[in-house]
Every structure is written in structure tokens, then in C-alpha cells.
């Protein structure tokens, strides 16, 4: 039974393990080679339980964001701190790691379908499909599948549901948090939009300093906090609240300019 053991979604773990190993080896230099991924807070990952953890993050590309998380999570769980040096951590990857993705995206070609086997929980967008605005009810099966994944392990979600910055948080994420009561860990990424194309499959620029920050779990009163309060908390946590668009002090601008010197494109 060992080699054919499956996860709750029917995926054979032996195949998933090899898929993560191969995909990880093929993409490693995208974050440590062609570009540099600067990681902060990865030690937080080692203190989390093995299941019922929800990671919430801002979103910059379809696939590169998630792939970086597979690298950082597995590297941290294998003993590395803020580093993905030496891809030996891919030999024994965390197999109960999932990510929420639009079904439309994961069916758009052979490669997305293969990547879906690595842990995608596909959901139907309620507001957009094939580039057009729509309005439909939430598919309760989608929510149920996220609950199944949380019961089995860790789940990554992008609560804005789009790669465009400053878009509002979808309330569905807050409802999931209230219903399943996971530990909620925010992640803030940057530099991916400059490094990759929108899909995150093609390298657009090299020599980009990418950043990846893992924050402490949020303090949430699952019973008494309103959906609106949780949404606002998520906006602040992943630094997508409108207040982050405020006028930036001069000293912060100067510090950012120094950092941008490391982000200059190399041709």
C-alpha cells in the first residue's frame, strides 16, 4: 500500500513527492541564482503544528509565488533558517501542503495541470471568468475542499484573488477562518512581479532582489470577531490595506532607494 498511498484528494503521494523534487530542482535557480530571494522569519514555520495552518499572502504571479513557498517551507522544515541554499531539502518534501488556485488557471495548459497535482485546491471564481466580470454563488464544494486540506495539513491562499495590488480581500477567506479556525500565518512577498511574467513561468528580468517575509500568526477571536474585522486584519497583515498607500516619509524613501540599487536589472 505504501507506494500507492493517497492524500484525501486521491493524489498518489509517491508521484507528488517526485513531482515536487523535479519541479523544485528545475526552479531553484529562479530564487537563488538568476535572482536572489531574501527571506525573513522562516523560523516561525518550524514552530507550527502539522495541520490546520492557513497561510495568507499578497499575490504577484500565478505560479512563482507558490513555488517559492514550497522552497521556503521545505527548506525551513529541514533545518535551514532564512535560506534555500542546497536543494537537499527537496528529497523529503512536506506532502500535506496545498494551495488554493482558480480552476480556470490550473486547466490552462499541460504545465498548470501537472503543477496542480503538487497540491492545488481548485476553486471557481465568483467574480471573474475568462477575462469577464461575472456574479455567481460560492460553490460550497470548494469551501469543503479547503476544509479537508486544512484538516490534513497546511494551506496557502491569496485572499485578494488577483495578482493586481491593492485589490480588496475576498470575504470568503474570513468565512473559512471563522468556520475552520486555523492558525493564520501572513506572508508578504515582493520582487516577483519584476522577476517574472504574469504567469510566473518565464523569467522577465534577472538580478532582482526578491523578498519573502513570514510574520507571526494572527491573534483572532474566531467566535466573536466579525468577518469585516478579520478582512481588515488580513489587509494589514499582508500589507494591502489602503493605508499603505499613504505618503511615505523621506527617510523611508531614501532607504528604499538604497534597496533598489540591489534591484537594478541586469541584461
Feature locations, PLM:
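Amphipathic coiled-coil/heptad-repeat helices and related helical stalk/stem segments
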Residues: 38-41, 107, 139-143, 169-173
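Internal catalytic-core helix/loop-beta-alpha segment
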Residues: 121-166
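A transmembrane-helix-recognition feature enriched in membrane-embedded lipid enzymes
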Residues: 2-40, 68, 109-118
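Short, highly charged C-terminal tails/helix-capping segments
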Residues: 249-267
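Helix-to-loop junction immediately C-terminal to a conserved catalytic motif
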Residues: 27-60, 70
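Short, well-structured alpha-helical segments that form the helix of a local strand-helix-strand
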Residues: 230-242
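A cross-family acyltransferase "interaction/gating" segment
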Residues: 151-156, 161-229
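Catalytic core of membrane glycerolipid acyltransferases/transacylases, capturing the structured
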Residues: 49-133
Amino acid at each position: 500500500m505504501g507506494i500507492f498511498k493517497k492524500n484525501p484528494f486521491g493524489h498518489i503521494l509517491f508521484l507528488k513527492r517526485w513531482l515536487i523534487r523535479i519541479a523544485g530542482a528545475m526552479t531553484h535557480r529562479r530564487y537563488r541564482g538568476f535572482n536572489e530571494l531574501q527571506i525573513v522569519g522562516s523560523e516561525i514555520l518550524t514552530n507550527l503544528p502539522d495541520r490546520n495552518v492557513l497561510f495568507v499572502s499578497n499575490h504577484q504571479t500565478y505560479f512563482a509565488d507558490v513555488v517559492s513557498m514550497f522552497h521556503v517551507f521545505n527548506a525551513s522544515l529541514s533545518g535551514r533558517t532564512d535560506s534555500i541554499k542546497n536543494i537537499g531539502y527537496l528529497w523529503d518534501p512536506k506532502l500535506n501542503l496545498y494551495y488554493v488556485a482558480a480552476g480556470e488557471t490550473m486547466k490552462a495548459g499541460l504545465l498548470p495541470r501537472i503543477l496542480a497535482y503538487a497540491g492545488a485546491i481548485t476553486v471557481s471564481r465568483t467574480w471573474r471568468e475568462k477575462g469577464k466580470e461575472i456574479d455567481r454563488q460560492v460553490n460550497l464544494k470548494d469551501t469543503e475542499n479547503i476544509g479537508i486540506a486544512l484538516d490534513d495539513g497546511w494551506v496557502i491562499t491569496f485572499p485578494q484573488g488577483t495578482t493586481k495590488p491593492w485589490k480588496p480581500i475576498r470575504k470568503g477567506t474570513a468565512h473559512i477562518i471563522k468556520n475552520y479556525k486555523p492558525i493564520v500565518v501572513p506572508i508578504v512577498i515582493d520582487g516577483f512581479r519584476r522577476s517574472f511574467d504574469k504567469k510566473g513561468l518565464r523569467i522577465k528580468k534577472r538580478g532582482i532582489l526578491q523578498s519573502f517575509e513570514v510574520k507571526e500568526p494572527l491573534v483572532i477571536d474566531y467566535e466573536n470577531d466579525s468577518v469585516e474585522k478579520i478582512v481588515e486584519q488580513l489587509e494589514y497583515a499582508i500589507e494591502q490595506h489602503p493605508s499603505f498607500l499613504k505618503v511615505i516619509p523621506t527617510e523611508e524613501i531614501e532607504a528604499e532607494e538604497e534597496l533598489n540599487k540591489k534591484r537594478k536589472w541586469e541584461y
